[in-house]
Design a protein with these regions (language model features):
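N-terminal lobe/hinge region of extracytoplasmic solute-binding protein
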Residues: 52-102, 221
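Surface-exposed binding/hinge segments that line
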Residues: 126, 142-204
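Gly/Pro-rich hinge or "lid" segments in bacterial periplasmic/extracellular proteins
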Residues: 176, 182-252, 256, 266
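Ligand/substrate-recognition segments at binding pockets and active sites
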Residues: 233-235, 379-454, 526
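Ligand-site clamp/hinge motif
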Residues: 244-288
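Structural transition elements
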Residues: 345-384, 405-407
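Extracytoplasmic/peripheral linker and loop segments enriched in polar/acidic and small residues
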Residues: 370-372, 423-436, 464-531, 554
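Long beta-strand-rich cores associated with HINT superfamily self-processing modules
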Residues: 528-554
């Protein structure tokens, strides 16, 4: 049944009215703008920065978000106890003064005088509510595990349903004082506090919004350098403006940020050359054309791309078949001929330049490599698998993002596997990133080309995800010896001896790779174009990839 545009418009206005009545006040002068509208830069205090992203923001809820793009936008509009400086070290943000006990188990934090974008003060209770919500099984946060990584008292037990959220080691002594208790000292605790999962949420505002929280501009509350002026799920344009009430507003020179979702590389560069973008990511085909341009930048990230395999699927539960797949595609060709963006081949789980050990050396220094391309060896594993499984042919579907680079890499891997492992057919299913992640988390897949970025500068950020039951353990691998080793390195005997812990982490990586839990592909580099009148963008390989607080555009 069809309705006229006029009737549809009236219905939309009525629905919007009810939405604003139920949960208003995202900003004091918030605007209900369409998701494709651009924002005219009328401010005299700075300029609008226009940034290309290659996927939609999946969530603006700090306790629900899981992907790098969502984290980047969240960090622009929300701030926690700490933030990252330009050199990647943790510095106080909402925290004004931090006292740490001698045993490293108690942090007493005095908060700055700050407020939300609706004028409400940011209080210690906002952190208590947010952190309890993070670990509450009812929230079903994919990042609930990170509270345990941070060592917060009782976090793991609450996540496992053995204790209640109000038993979490965080209390509000008063509106300005927060007391945090840990189970064990965590050397990277401060840097973890800059991660979006630990951002505050105002309980009263959250309760008014209900299940609409963080889904529209009027259901998002901001306390960061910028505030949201237009957003809705699957929006292709997201607009932010400078938050005049931000505690450090004097240092914010931009009038706002406009994120534009553009997945096609040719359209991206056309927009960049036309002046519609200030920051753009290049595809591999474009690197040679623009790498001599003074606006070209090459930046290494901590992201590891790999193929996840579902161990519940017949055949993929066979170690030899997984090894055959992993060794069958040419990683050097992927990074040198397809990506061309500074990415490096991955024969590992824990990336290079992530963390240094007690000896001052990078984790990869002196550490073995695994699952390197070897097409002859791949055939040997394939023959063993066929004998063990009693089959001569296999067919699997690989889930991938709809971003152009992911499609190019996937098509190359598809051709390599089908050529080098005769009788194996690989189909490709392309989905928006959000849907692809949902399928992976639900174990509703066979193979999936995916990535993981480091949340903090320690190998555990790549190792903890493979414990039994982890929401990020795509494909449901389980190994009780591995689980015990990781638990001891986190909070047991090994956690108290840095050298033994480091060796345990190397052993853990070896266990994952020897079992071919993943098929590693590459560590991501980024080839970007940045207009010459833009400076001060902070790039981080850990946590938030790009920070724009100190960016200027002349």
């Amino acid at each position: 049944m069809k309705m006229t545009r006029k009737i549809l418009a009236i219905i939309s206005i009525i629905a919007l009215t009810f939405s604003l009545t139920a949960c208003g006040g995202g900003t004091k002068d918030s605007k209900a703008e369409g998701n494709n509208e651009s924002v005219e830069d009328t401010s005299t205090s700075g300029s609008l920065l226009k940034v290309q992203i290659d996927a939609e923001v999946a969530s603006m809820d700090p306790q629900i978000a899981t992907d790098g793009i969502s984290f980047e936008v969240l960090a622009a509009v929300t701030e926690g106890l700490y933030s990252l400086s330009d050199d990647g070290s943790a510095v106080e943000a909402i925290a004004d003064k931090v006292e740490k006990s001698e045993d490293g188990l108690t942090y007493t934090v005095t908060l700055k005088d700050t407020k939300w974008s609706n004028g409400t003060p940011v209080t210690a209770k906002d952190f208590v509510f947010a952190w309890r919500r993070l670990v509450d099984p009812a929230t079903a946060s994919e990042y609930s595990f990170i509270a345990g990584i941070a060592g917060i008292k009782n976090a793991d037990a609450i996540v496992n349903g053995e204790m209640t959220p109000d038993q979490l080691g965080i209390t509000a002594k008063d509106d300005k004082t927060l007391v945090i208790e840990l189970d064990t000292p965590v050397p990277f605790f401060e840097s973890l506090m800059a991660f979006p999962s630990f951002f505050p949420v105002n309980e009263e505002f959250y309760n008014k919004c209900g299940d609409k929280f963080a889904t529209t501009v009027d259901t998002i509350l901001c306390n960061g350098a910028f505030k949201v002026t237009s957003y809705e799920p699957a929006a292709t344009t997201i607009n932010l403006e400078k938050n005049a009430d931000y505690w450090d507003a004097d240092k914010v020179k931009l009038s706002g940020i406009q994120y534009q979702v553009i997945k096609d590389s040719q359209q991206t560069m056309l927009s960049y050359q036309n002046g519609d973008l200030d920051v753009a990511t290049l595809s591999g085909e474009q690197v040679e054309q623009f790498q001599a341009d003074p606006e070209f930048k090459n930046i290494m990230s901590g992201y590891l791309w790999y193929i996840a395999s579902n161990k519940k699927v017949a055949g993929l539960d066979n170690e030899n078949l997984r090894k055959a797949i992993s060794l069958s595609y040419d990683k050097e060709a992927i990074v040198n001929n397809i990506l061309k963006d500074g990415s490096i081949k991955a024969d590992f789980l824990v990336p290079t330049l992530l963390a240094t050990g007690p000896d001052g050396k990078d984790f990869r220094d002196g550490t073995d490599t695994y699952l390197s391309t070897d097409k002859a060896k791949a055939l040997e594993y394939y023959d063993k698998a066929k004998t063990e499984l009693g089959k001569d042919s296999f067919e699997y579907t690989m889930l991938i993002d709809d971003a152009e680079s992911a499609q190019n890499v996937a098509q190359f891997i598809q051709a390599e596997i089908q050529t080098n492992l005769p009788g194996m057919k690989i189909n490709i299913e392309t989905l928006p990133k959000k849907n692809r992640l949902e399928r992976l988390r639900a174990d509703d897949f066979e193979l999936g080309l995916t990535r993981w970025g480091p949340d903090y500068a320690d190998p555990m950020t790549y190792l903890d995800m493979w414990i039994t039951g982890s929401p990020n353990n795509y494909g449901a691998w389980s190994n009780t010896e591995y689980d015990s080793l990781i638990q001891s390195a986190k909070k047991g005997e090994l956690a108290l001896d840095s050298e033994k812990r480091w060796e345990a982490l190397k052993k853990a990586e070896k266990m994952v790779m020897d079992d071919a839990v993943i098929c590693p592909v590459y560590q991501q580099g980024n080839a970007v174009m940045i207009k010459k009148n833009v400076s001060g963008i902070e790039f981080h390989s850990v946590g938030i990839n790009r920070v724009y607080k100190n960016t200027t555009k002349n």
